[in-house]
A protein has these predicted regions:
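Short glycine-dipeptide loop
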Residues: 194, 218, 224, 328-332
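Conserved class I S-adenosyl-L-methionine
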Residues: 194-203
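Mobile active-site "lid"/loop adjacent to the S-adenosyl-L-methionine
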Residues: 234-235, 275-334, 377-378, 382, ...
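Conserved SAM/SAH-binding loop
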Residues: 204-205, 291
């Protein structure tokens, strides 16, 4: 039975059972303590290797084969098929966003234009019939795979249109190019729109995006729940900003930079305004591992694979999972959840009650007592299986193993855990401390923490009224009314209704500037940032909604609408909205330059002239369209231009069924100087 309140999905060593286990200046800044266990390892747990795998042709490892054959994980009659799949390239897989009108249209177009087509091409001197098939275990028919690796797809001229479609729609957040097995863990977590979710080791972010999508499953309404996407590596955190914040277009996510095994206690206000320790409703824990399941795409592993890599990471895995369990709601002991009835078409193997412990030479040790003294630092007690009675009580068979030869995927290990009682062990810091909201809870250990990386600019919320922010706002907006200036004039300029005053908006400006982006976050993200910014390094949060720009004297408000956050702003607007036909929208998007107003229809020309210069939203609800298109635009004195980047322009052309123009736009043949000019202005 799936827990409806507290789940944590945990991926441990792939194939191997293990115990749960901008100021632009680089300098040391206060925040978390670095975990030296990971200094030499990347996300996968493997040391960084040069990208020369295209020269690796021998996909064979005697050490790997000895280990897995000794374990008996793979039935003898399946062994050759298992090795054959491991030695072949991994198919490219992707999924469409659920509960999105544009995603529904894109999915239908994909099925009509590409799914039924059969294409022949040559890959490594072999004639290949390219097939696209639906991944039958993924819900609602939203996931697909192509029987070509990513590099081969990119190089085939016969498949250029399909490749362009995938790249453009990925950049716009309509689909996610994601390994099939990576899609599985979030599907077992039963995400609801009010849940607080922690992704402890989030980079590169594909599963984080999945979690965010599930948070938005109820439709267009802004969820009250949120996702904290954390990663140890500072550089990978900025990849997360692009993957999780930009592509998901969600105001319900924040990126943090912290060692997952030392993720600090964080605090949120309760209904009485008192700060209490946050216990997350769901936690995804994709721990560093030996990457056995990635052999099909990480070819260097064939040379580098070693059982000691898994042993070296075991303690770290356990520390991360234990910390995650402490952060999970209603603290206590855990049990493995039986998810055998979920995703019935997903072929999986059950977890094992017993496994063998080998050293680097292939010697098997039945118990810790048999391990030589010189190996006990590497082969420790925690690596050995429990007694059979304990294994039965723990229901280890409820773990899931995904093997490559079952459904032509990578490999994965998954365990879904649920809290059911109190822990018999403690980290020594488990009290739910209650203090008045806003009071600093910084402990001596937190004060002494230091973190490598870039010093982040502060988060400044526009609807706060403390003295420090008032002084800052008076300088920034050159108005005695401070942040009230923004809300008053923007509300009046765009005709915002009363709900706009409740928006949680922030800036990341350390110094006064004529440029600046305003981000939208939901209320709980605001509380998280305000009450925990001194406890954990926060990289970024929120959805770009407004941007300050240089304007002429005739424009009363020097803020423009940003495409990313337009869907949350338009329902509040009653002014500066322009209805536009499909043909005129196509004309605007395909234009290399801004369009002169005199070249538009008389009706549209009249509407735009009446609105006047400045930012506006163009809305196209064509009769035969299955969704409404909303485009942030800039109206000049005599011209109009949509404020879209190349990918968004190509995306709208796809949606408006002008595929050739979309391909030309993406390749660069359809872009012009208007984007560069507008970017220079703002």
């Amino acid at each position: 039975m799936i827990c409806r309140k507290q789940n944590v999905a945990v991926k441990l060593n792939k194939f191997k059972i293990s115990e749960m286990g901008k100021s632009k200046r680089h300098r040391k800044v206060k925040f978390g303590k670095r975990n030296n266990d990971l200094d030499a390892f990347g996300k996968s747990g493997m040391k960084a290797l040069p990208k020369n795998d295209r020269f690796i042709t021998d996909r064979h490892s005697s050490r790997f084969e000895i280990f897995y054959r000794t374990q008996g994980f793979i039935p003898e009659e399946e062994w050759e098929l298992f090795l054959k799949h491991l030695a072949s390239d991994l198919p490219q897989s992707f999924r469409f966003v659920e509960n999105s009108k544009e995603g529904t249209v894109a999915l239908q177009m994909f099925k009509e234009k590409f799914l039924s087509k059969v294409t022949r091409c040559t890959v490594e001197n072999e004639d290949v019939i390219v097939k696209i098939r639906e991944i039958n275990w993924y819900p609602n028919g939203l996931a697909f795979e192509i029987n070509l690796p990513k590099k081969a797809l990119r190089r085939q001229t016969e498949l250029q249109s399909l490749h362009n479609f995938l790249v453009v729609e990925t950049a716009c957040g309509i689909l996610s190019r994601q390994e099939a097995v990576s899609m599985i863990p979030p599907l077992f977590m039963d995400i609801k729109s009010h849940h607080s979710i922690l992704d402890m080791c989030a980079s590169p972010g594909s599963k984080t995006v999945q979690l965010i999508e599930m948070l938005h499953a109820d439709g267009e309404a802004l969820p009250t729940g949120f996702v904290i996407a954390n990663d140890l590596n500072n550089k990978r955190c900025y990849l997360l900003v692009h993957q999780s914040l930009r592509r998901s277009s969600s105001p319900c996510c924040v990126i943090t930079n912290c060692d997952a095994s030392q993720f600090p206690d964080v605090f949120m206000p309760d209904k009485f305004g008192k700060l209490t320790k946050l216990k997350f409703d769901r936690i995804l824990c994709d721990v560093p591992c030996s990457s056995d399941g990635t052999l099909r795409k990480n070819l260097n592993l064939w040379k580098e694979w070693h059982v000691n890599q898994a042993y070296a990471l075991h303690r770290l895995q356990r520390k991360i999972v234990e910390r995650g369990l402490h952060l999970l709601a209603t603290g206590g002991a855990v049990e493995l959840v039986d998810v055998g009835n979920q995703l019935p078409q997903l072929v999986r193997s059950k977890g094992f009650h017993h496994w063998k412990v080998l050293d680097a030479e292939g010697n098997v040790y039945a118990s810790p007592d048999e391990v030589p003294d010189e190996l006990k630092s590497k082969i420790h007690n925690g690596l050995f299986p429990p007694d059979e009675s304990v294994a039965e009580k723990l229901h280890l068979e409820r773990c899931l193993r995904i093997f490559p030869h079952h459904q032509n995927t990578g490999g994965f290990f998954i365990a879904v855990l649920r809290k059911v009682g109190e822990f018999s062990w403690s980290t020594g810091n488990e009290a739910d401390v209650l203090v008045p909201s806003g009071q600093n809870l910084k402990s001596s250990s937190e004060q002494n923490r230091r973190y490598d990386g870039i010093k982040e600019d502060p988060f400044v919320f526009l609807n706060d009224d403390n003295n420090e922010l008032i002084q800052y706002g008076q300088l920034l907006f050159q108005s005695q009314s401070c942040f009230a200036f923004f809300f008053h004039f923007v509300r009046e300029y765009f005709g915002m209704d009363d709900r706009f005053s409740n928006f949680s908006l922030l800036m990341r400006q350390k110094e006064v500037s004529k440029k600046g982006i305003i981000y939208l976050v939901n209320e709980n993200i605001k509380h998280f940032i305000k009450n925990n910014e001194h406890r954990i390094k926060i990289i970024n949060a929120g959805l770009r909604t407004f941007s300050r720009c240089s304007v002429s004297d005739s424009v009363r408000v020097d803020f423009r609408l940003v495409q990313d956050g337009l869907r949350y702003v338009i329902p509040l607007m009653s002014k500066r909205l322009v209805n536009i036909s499909k043909d005129e929208l196509l004309k605007l998007i395909k234009s290399k330059e801004s369009i002169l107003l005199k070249d538009l229809s008389d009706e549209l020309h009249s509407q735009l002239k009446q609105i006047g210069e400045g930012s506006a939203a163009l809305v196209c609800g064509a009769e035969n369209a299955k969704c409404t298109f909303q485009v942030a635009s800039w109206l000049g004195r005599c011209s109009v231009a949509p404020h879209l980047d190349k990918e968004n322009r190509a995306h709208f052309l796809f949606m408006l069924d002008d595929l050739q123009a979309a391909y030309d736009m993406y390749k660069g043949n359809g872009t012009g100087g208007v984007d560069a000019k507008l970017e220079a202005v703002v």
